[in-house]
Structures are given as C-alpha cells and as structure tokens.
Amino acid sequence: GSEMCIRDSIRPDDIIKNYGADILRLWAASVDYRNDIKIGDNIVKQLSEIFKKTRNTARFLLGNLYDFDPAKDYVAYEDLKPLDKFALHKLNELIANVTEAFEAYEFYKYFQCLQNFAAVDLSAFYLDIVKDRLYTAGKKSLSRRACQTVLYEICSALNRILVPVMPHQAEDIWRNTPEAQKAGKPESIILSDWPTTNEKWNNPEIEADFTEILKLRETVTKAIEVLRGNKIVGSSLEVAVTVTGDKVALLNKYASELKSVFITSQATVSAQKPEDVLSEHSEHGYTAWVTKAKGHKCERCWKYSELSTEAGYLSLIH
C-alpha cells in the first residue's frame, strides 16, 4: 500500500512517480529472490538507463521498418545473408532462454538474457553493421529488404518478450509496428501470442562461424582503435584491413562479407603483410594489418573506392 517501503529507503510509489511502473517491474525481474534483495537510487538509475537503451533499440527497429510491408517485402530465409541468419539464430536462442526462465520462475535470467541480446547481439554487433545496408542500399533492394525482414522478426518477438515486465513500453512499440497494422491483429500486444522458436532459424554452423568472426572482428577493432587513439584516423571507413589466421578456409568463406563486418572500406584475406602498415594486432589466432583505404571517398556512403571519379561514379557506389 501507500505506506509500504523497501528497506525504509525507497517507496515503490516514488519509483513509479519518478521513473514509471515499468522500471519498478524491471527491478523486480532483475533480482534473484532467493538471495538478499538490494535496491537504491543507483540501482534504480541503472535500470532506468537499461530501459532507455531498450527503448532506443526499439526506436531504431521501428524507424527502419516504416516502409516495410511484410506481405510484399519479406525475404525468404534461404535468401538472407549469413549475418542475417546469425541474427535470427541469436533471436531463437533468446526466445528459448527467456521462455525457460519464465517457466522456472527465474525472472532474473530473463533480465540477463534480454539485456545481453539488446546490448551485445544487437546494438554492438548486428545493428552496428547493417546500418550501411539500411541507409544506402536501394529502397527495395534484396539486401535492404533482407535486413528489414530480420528487424521485423526481432521487433515482433522482442515486443512480446517485453510484455510481462515492461507492458507500457511494449504497448507503445506495438502501436507503431507494421504487424499491428495487419487486419485481424489484436488491438493490444497483451492479447497476442508468446513468441515461439523457429526450427529453420536454428543454425549451429552459422553460430560456430560467427563465433570466430566475432573474435576476428575484435582483433581488427583493436588494431583500428590504436589509430583512432592517436588521431591518425577518425572513422574505420578511412582504413583498409588485411587479415590472416589459422582458419584460412573460414576467412576465405566470408571474404566478401568482411569489410561490412569490420565497417571498413576494404578488407582482404592474405598471409602477406602489406606495405605502409599503420597498425597491427594479433589475437585469438588472427592477425590484422591496417593501412589507409585506397581511392576516393563516396559522398553517399563515406566508403573509399578506387572507382573512377568521372561521371559521378563515387556517388553511385551503392
């Protein structure tokens, strides 16, 4: 009731007044009730930041689905890029893990899974990489629609996963999704079904490959960060990367995707160290050599290319 307080320090109604009911519910879901339960101003503020990040992720998803019509633009799984398939594999894992956590009344695991997916799998990896496809690829190109298909599935599942703990935020998201505009869909997200895993998205081979790709990306990022720290380059798009390592077959398999994964203008697989190396780093069985990107900067995507500067080609890389 109104007189209830937690450790005589923070009143639940004060949390609701200052942060909203979803934050109080998020706190309840974040603690392991089998151990001592802690709460304080700093904890509530941290949860508020997590809430905002989740909201910003949802805003990014919705902002890039404004022109996506699932009935016309949805891309079949077989036509998705490997990175897209990896994202759906991680989404499948999230659905399975949070469902298991709820069924076992281990709500804190739900919180951990949700936070890791939003911060690590999405914001720090998938969404960071696909921005180029979303912003510069042709509006109805296969590349952009494939990415939108994944964002659509993520938004749909993530929205439902938010409902038990953050229903107000979930409702706000639902009202702006392409799915909610379909005829016959529930007026409220609360009336929709809980998400289920999709067997087609389960892809252990892709997961194994991208576990290594993530290690390679970390190696490359550390080499580039040295240049950023010394203010030799400002953006990763200003560099070209040459990589080598023990798993050459894997590197060659994804050679055409690497510049997108690294967010660099060029990426090459070669055991031969290039000339004019500005920075290098070795880790996880991989070595990355960083040089200045060759060519001229595209006005549209900011990538460097050796395409002719005549006839406006640099504005038409994508």
Give the residues covered by each predicted segment.
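Core structural elements
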Residues: 49-62, 84-93, 112-133
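Short cysteine-rich clusters marking metal-coordination/redox-active sites
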Residues: 298, 314-315
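Short, non-ligating residues that shape and space the ligands of small metal-coordination modules
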Residues: 307-310
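Structured, non-catalytic alpha/beta "coupling" segments that mediate domain-domain communication
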Residues: 44-70, 164-178, 249-276
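Acidic, turn-prone loop/beta-hairpin segments
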Residues: 68-96, 128-223, 230-245, 271, ...
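Short, small-residue-biased leader/transition segments that mark boundaries at the very start
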Residues: 1-6
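Cys/His-coordinated zinc-binding microdomains
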Residues: 302-305
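Catalytic adenosine-cofactor/nucleotide-binding cores of aminoacyl-tRNA synthetases and other
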Residues: 7-80, 179-185, 230-235
